[in-house]
Curated annotation (Swiss-Prot):
The gene is htpG. This is Chaperone protein HtpG. It is found in: Cytoplasm. CDD domains: HATPase_Hsp90-like (cd16927). PANTHER family: HEAT SHOCK PROTEIN 90 FAMILY MEMBER (PTHR11528).
Amino acid sequence: MSHTETHAFQTEVNQLLKLMIHALYSNKEIFLRELVSNASDALDKLRFESVSNDALSEGESELAIQVGFDKEARTVSIIDNGIGMTRDEVIANIGTIANSGTKKFLENMTGDQAKDSHLIGQFGVGFYASFIVADKVTLTTRKAGDDKSEGTRWESAGEGEYTLETVEKETKGTEITLHLKEDMDEFLDDFRLKSIITTYSDHINFPIKMWQVKLDEEGKETEEKSLEQVNKATAIWTQPKSELSDEDYNNFYQTISHDYENPLAHIHNKVEGTLEYTSLLYLPKKAPFDLYDRDRRYGLKLYVKRVFIMDDAEHLMPTYLRFVRGVIDSNDLPLNVSREILQSNRVVDKIRSASVKRVLDQLAKMAKAEDQSDYETFWDQFGNVMKEGVIEDFANKDKIAKLLRFSSTHESSGPTQRVSLQDYIDRMGEGQEAIYYITADTYAAATGSPHLEMFRKKGIEVLLLTDRIDEWLVSHLTEFEGKQLKSVTSADLKEFDEEADKELSEEDKKAREALTEKVKKAIEDQVSDVKITHRLTDSPACVVSAEGDISAHMARMMEQMGQAMPKQKPVLELNPDHALVKKLDSLEDEPKVKEWSLFLLEQAQLAEGDQLEKPADFIKRMNALLSEVI
């Protein structure tokens, strides 16, 4: 007759149970992940110890995990034929936190065995996840090699104590039975359990089997059942690249991404040395609908020694690469005790840095390819978020800058963004020292801007920046390959003014100074300065931002986002060769000068996409001036 003993949990275990049941894990289904993971550890231990002691296998050739449920008894069971535990090991490993047998086993391993151990139980807490869904847990185990009479049964309701009993157990290994809580019936379902296994344990190194109802020739259920494997038990990323086809890579991508299209590219690397991990990364062909939702969780799937730990491991990839899909499988990546949140440390930083480099290198390769179609597809889908990288990732700013694409005034460009900064530099004329750009709300607004008139006349290409992020982009990317990026709407375009001023007589210069002073006096409350410009050929006037001010386009965007912006006075630039400006110059009556000056200012502001404070006044003013010439 067996003897039953009652033991109290170690104090820390009591605390852990309360914490885990109520708060520690983010979803209750991970109990199965933890128990399958523990079973995998036990099989790993047996496999290695059997190398030096074949008797431990006890004649069983296949190492496997079995998952089942009993609707009537309301139980879920997880069975393995692994190494098992002695009575003392049960007390030490289950009754005591952070003292798991796996951790001690690792300490005793050396050489190549440690590399392939795939052991994940360093924290010794996974077993307690059982109590998230169960109000009683029964564990029956026998150490491989021990007599059948030396089995141990452990049982607890998770309320401060557990019982131990010596029992007979025919087979080595461990069987865990969870007596489910009243509200946990969802786990008494074949499809639900298989779904959890597929999500968390598909790539465990051992087969996971469940009893499946056999079907007859017509596909109908019969009374017979058979044990069927429900996981793949092969991790594609652990296989040599030479043994994998594009179809293999594409199928796995569709599995992890739930994307029906194939990816644009995959990046598969195995790193060995002081840091050991494997990465399999994918570049999607199409952006997800929530790509611009900054609150959405993103990131890679994290595995530790082929055991799934979490989706969306955001520490492993920066925000601007949030579209990258794939897995990181680490042999030594540290996790916190819940295994739900990555610890940010040197190892994480190294994996992240190397992964970012591989993605950027792959994109650079695509961007340089003779066939640009893949990179063009990528840019059309993800170009906006790549621009975030210039702002967020200073270390890789130069690499990212080479990947940027824009539309431009070059004859072959059009509205699609196909022009790189290097393309622009290669087409620069002799003596040109800057890369010129204009920001606008739309392509049509950019191409219609008066600021482009002089650049078109001189045959100087201008980049057309029409994405909302572009204003922030150029505030961080101020030069490329030694060439300054300069806005055509900036007041600081002295190189063109100085060139034109050399051709003027002293008399003309004085006349123009008199014109600007007259206009500035008339509307000094509306402008910071008035200048003669040489950037216009067809328009009478334009407005530019004063030196040190943000651009008008940026100010509009900030206001649209609810930011209170201080009132900025623009610089009004006049085209002295235009008929309307000549008319203004001829006027002596101050009220008339003011009306004409305001008309040219407001017209220029409208051309730049600004909203007038009093549009009705502009219409009245325009009608009055038109009436004068009829």
